[in-house]
Amino acid sequence: MPIITLPDGSQRHFDNPVSTLEVAQSIGPGLAKATIAGRVNGARVDACDLIEHDASLEIITTKDEVDGLEIVRHSCAHLLGHALKQLYPNAKMAIGPTIDSGFYYDIDLEQSLSQEDLEKIEARMVELAKTKYAVVKKKVSWQEARDTFESRGESYKMEILDENVARDDRPGLYHHEEYIDMCRGPHVPHMGFCQNFKLLNIAGAYWRGNSDNKMLQRIYGTAFHDKKALQAHLTRLEEAAKRDHRKIGKQLDLFHMQQEAPGMVFWHHNGWSIFRDLEIFIRQKLNEYGYQEVKGPLMMDRVLWERSGHWDKYADAMFTTSSENREYAIKPMNCPGHIQIFNQGLKSYRDLPLRMAEFGSCHRNEPSGSLHGIMRVRGFTQDDAHIFCTEDQIQQEVTSCIKMVYDTYTTFGFQNIVVKLSTRPEKRVGSDEIWDKSEQALIDSLKAMDIPFEIQEGEGAFYGPKIEFTLYDCLDRAWQCGTVQLDFNLPTRLGATYVGESNERLIPVMIHRAILGSLERFIGILIEEYAGFFPTWLAPEQAVVVNITDKQADYAHEVAQKLQKCGIRAKADLRNEKIGFKIREHTLKRVPYMLVCGDQEMEAGEIAVRTRKGKDLGKFKLDDFIAHIQAEIASRKLNLEE
């Protein structure tokens, strides 16, 4: 007789084992109709799974925008598999998980699928979903599952069973009419819940993410509970496509990538201008917050990476080379090098905290399939810093880091920042005392600044707790950028010590701190956030002077020269083209200000000022405009609306 406790504290008694769906039916037909799955004692289960003992139950319905939506999307992946096998019986199914905002399925198919094929597959999915067929779950033995997939020629499913499922386990097989898939679940009870979906695109993906394996075809899709939410998401995707940093990067001549240097950025003059302005801005912040800037070597001996522990855990992601019988690794991160600098010379407690920052050129051997413009690269620059401090200084230093993070992000216009605090995992280094002290210091720092945060229990690194800062952009996309990470491990491994007040040797606490993360990635985020309409202080070209006829050419040239002498990135466009053509061209280049010189302006020593959004600011004396734009640049005003 299971007793089921509901979220409101009420209890329901049943004479026999009962399913989530049956509990919902006992409450009311409306709830039963909306029931997707259940959460029994915190664990998700299918709506049909029987609850045999007393338990707490949360009923997952179509109103659940987290678990409910994830289950719908996962079931849509199975629906995609169902449609694919009907249309392409020889296709071999690999995996079909959910991802942020959607799902995908990897398949092995001899023919290359096109966009037209995608439309045909989606149409078949619509046909199948309209029937609202029941999804039947069967728990079977390992051998029965393997025999099922062997009889169907599903070699990838067999490999998953052989390598990832214990022989005494009972895998779940989900029957979608004649199609069978294997999954932990849960899934929707019927396809009536999978009515609002869209297939998006096709990409290549190596089986198990290993380039030594076969390249499969990956079909991406998305799904929502209702048409309105789906359409809103598709609209966001359309806007994101318009803002794609790769597309805008080409339009504005910022950078390019090429096959001979995968994952490495070729910065053009315009893009490098943005990069340098970011460096200047961060350097000002470093000075303001008391950091010293350093520069470590690009490449260090394998011995050092072995001592740091990176060689054992990170070797596959490191680029290596050898010379004179010594093996070297190009650095994937800056921290071991910073400890080498710290270790030069005796340090006293009076020297702490020591804040060390670097624009470190790092390289990581990311899989080729994961590379994405300048957002995911192999060569990147970290705005990295490491703070060496005592245990008693942790809170003040973390508070300073958090202030610097918010000071930086708000300058770029990011207001929606989600903060997560990850606490100690089961396997860790350091005493409970230092973990207690450190976690409390992070909590106190966030609370003192009135910053809401989410605690992720057990999600910290083995060497210390951390705070992560995730930005949400204008399209509500999440970008994890900033990190404040405590480290009780690396200083010990690499022999960092200082002399304490009692003349004893002590090991400093090390705080890893990144704000932008990778400058390359952050520039990509800014390109898409601003759609290329950079604030004037970041714009590669801040003003362009255009003449109406040849008669004003000399005057326009003089205006441009004066702007340049005042530190403004400006040029004169003296081409023999119509004024409308020139203004349109520079508008497309997102130049913040267009300064028009006609006869009247030339005679009065003025300029007619127009913004890239088409706003007429009227006529300015040149000195007045220079003062205006200099103030705008100096204050780093966003001027996105103009």
From Swiss-Prot:
GO terms for molecular function: ATP binding; metal ion binding; threonine-tRNA ligase activity; tRNA binding. Its EC number is 6.1.1.3. Pfam families: HGTP_anticodon, TGS, tRNA-synt_2b, tRNA_SAD. It catalyses: tRNA(Thr) + L-threonine + ATP = L-threonyl-tRNA(Thr) + AMP + diphosphate + H(+). InterPro entries: aa-tRNA-synt_IIb, aa-tRNA-synth_II, aa-tRNA-synth_II/BPL/LPL, Anticodon-bd, Anticodon-bd_dom_sf, Beta-grasp_dom_sf, TGS, TGS-like. Residues 1-61 form the TGS domain. GO terms for biological process: threonyl-tRNA aminoacylation. Keywords: Aminoacyl-tRNA synthetase, ATP-binding, Cytoplasm, Ligase, Metal-binding, Nucleotide-binding, Protein biosynthesis, RNA-binding, tRNA-binding, Zinc. It is an enzyme of class 6 (ligase). Residues 244-535 are annotated as: Catalytic. Transmembrane segments: none annotated. SUPFAM superfamilies: Class II aaRS ABD-related, Class II aaRS and biotin synthetases, TGS-like, ThrRS/AlaRS common domain. GO terms for cellular component: cytosol. Zn(2+) binds at C335, H386, H512. Binds 1 zinc ion per subunit. Its cofactor is Zn(2+). It comes from the Bacteria. Catalyzes the attachment of threonine to tRNA(Thr) in a two-step reaction: L-threonine is first activated by ATP to form Thr-AMP and then transferred to the acceptor end of tRNA(Thr). Also edits incorrectly charged L-seryl-tRNA(Thr). Homodimer. This is Threonine--tRNA ligase. The lineage of its organism: Bacteria, Pseudomonadati, Pseudomonadota, Gammaproteobacteria, Vibrionales. The gene is thrS.
